[in-house]
């Protein structure tokens, strides 16, 4: 595996791989990698000949009160994990390389509707930052495919919409959330939890699972299910941000008759914001 830090170097390496007839996959990350990220790399190896991972802690997607400065930078450990996972090339630029004109005047990409509500309501500007950096990475790397985890479900929907609306010739794969044995979705932010909070955290997925079970049993009072779920989160020790049931593809509010749903939630344990979701298909 080689590590490159400039756009020029990456484009040259991609051109060589393309010249050899290789199919190229991109796995964008912010580093501090865990087993969920490496699962994406391993899936990419199955679907492509040349796997590019990127590590860039994107300042454009962090709000002023968020944890940009605290976000762990673990490049050496990440390189080892990527190598073991079968990555061919790591692109690890700094902010000056990605935003050479500075962020103040940076052209930004906005994906309306699907980015609104849910995490978009709690984190203004977040998905604009995500869409902008992903567009830049797609333009630089020109991958055939790109892989993202379903844990960040709204982000995945934003990226699918972006690619569709801008006619990008890139196939987007959403991969299932990787979980700890107790059900907690793997996340770089889990490291912020203390021992007591870590013991509480799996309740988030259990509560989503209970809602999914009720829906599959025929319950269609979605507002009532969400209200009970929010109360269950509070009783477990969370400070809920949201818990909603949406139509899976469009992310519009769910309605009776929808056959593919997703239950999405965000909640705080202390100062750590956890997100999770559960897809529910109704036969």
Swiss-Prot record:
InterPro entries linked to this entry: Cyt_trans-like, Pantoate_ligase, Pantoate_ligase_C, Rossmann-like_a/b/a_fold
Location in the cell: Cytoplasm
Domain of life: Bacteria
Pathway stated in the Swiss-Prot or TrEMBL entry: Cofactor biosynthesis; (R)-pantothenate biosynthesis; (R)-pantothenate from (R)-pantoate and beta-alanine: step 1/1
SUPFAM superfamilies named in the record: Nucleotidylyl transferase (SSF52374)
Residues binding beta-alanine, per UniProt: 61
Any single GO BP term: pantothenate biosynthetic process
Keyword Cytoplasm: yes
Positions with a binding annotation for (R)-pantoate: 61, 155
Catalytic activity: (R)-pantoate + beta-alanine + ATP = (R)-pantothenate + AMP + diphosphate + H(+)
Active site: 37 (proton donor)
Principal location: cytoplasm
The protein's Enzyme Commission number: 6.3.2.1
Keywords: ATP-binding, Cytoplasm, Ligase, Nucleotide-binding, Pantothenate biosynthesis
GO CC field: cytosol
Any GO molecular function: ATP binding
General function of this protein: Catalyzes the condensation of pantoate with beta-alanine in an ATP-dependent reaction via a pantoyl-adenylate intermediate.
Subunit and partners: Homodimer.
Entry similarity comment: Belongs to the pantothenate synthetase family.
Note: The reaction proceeds by a bi uni uni bi ping pong mechanism.
Name by which UniProt lists this protein: Pantothenate synthetase
Native source organism of the sequence: Azotobacter vinelandii (strain DJ / ATCC BAA-1303)
């Amino acid at each position: 595996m080689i590590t490159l830090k400039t756009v020029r170097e990456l484009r040259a390496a991609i051109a060589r791989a393309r010249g050899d007839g290789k199919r190229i996959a991109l796995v964008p990350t912010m580093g501090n990698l865990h087993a969920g990220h490496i699962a994406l790399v391993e899936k990419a190896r199955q679907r492509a000949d040349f796997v590019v991972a990127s590590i860039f802690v994107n300042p454009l997607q962090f709000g002023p009160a968020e944890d940009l400065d605290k976000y762990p930078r673990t490049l050496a450990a990440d390189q080892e994990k990527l190598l073991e996972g079968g990555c061919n090339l790591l692109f690890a630029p700094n902010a000056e390389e990605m935003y050479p004109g500075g962020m103040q005047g940076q052209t930004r990409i906005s994906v309306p509707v699907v980015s609104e509500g849910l995490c978009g309501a709690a984190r203004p500007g977040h998905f604009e930052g995500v869409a902008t950096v992903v567009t830049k990475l797609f333009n630089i790397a020109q991958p055939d495919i790109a892989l993202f985890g379903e844990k960040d479900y709204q982000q995945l929907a934003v990226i699918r919409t972006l690619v569709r609306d801008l006619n990008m010739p890139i196939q987007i794969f959403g991969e299932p959330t990787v979980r700890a044995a107790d059900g907690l979705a793997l996340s770089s932010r889990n490291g912020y939890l203390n021992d007591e909070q870590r013991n509480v955290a799996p309740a988030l997925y259990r509560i989503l699972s209970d809602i999914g079970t009720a829906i599959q049993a025929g319950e269609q009072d979605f507002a009532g299910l969400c209200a009970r779920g929010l109360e269950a989160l509070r009783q477990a020790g969370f400070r809920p941000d949201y818990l909603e049931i949406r139509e899976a593809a469009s992310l519009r509010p769910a309605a009776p008759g929808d056959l593919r749903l997703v239950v999405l939630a965000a909640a705080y344990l202390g100062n750590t914001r956890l997100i999770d979701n559960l897809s529910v298909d109704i036969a």
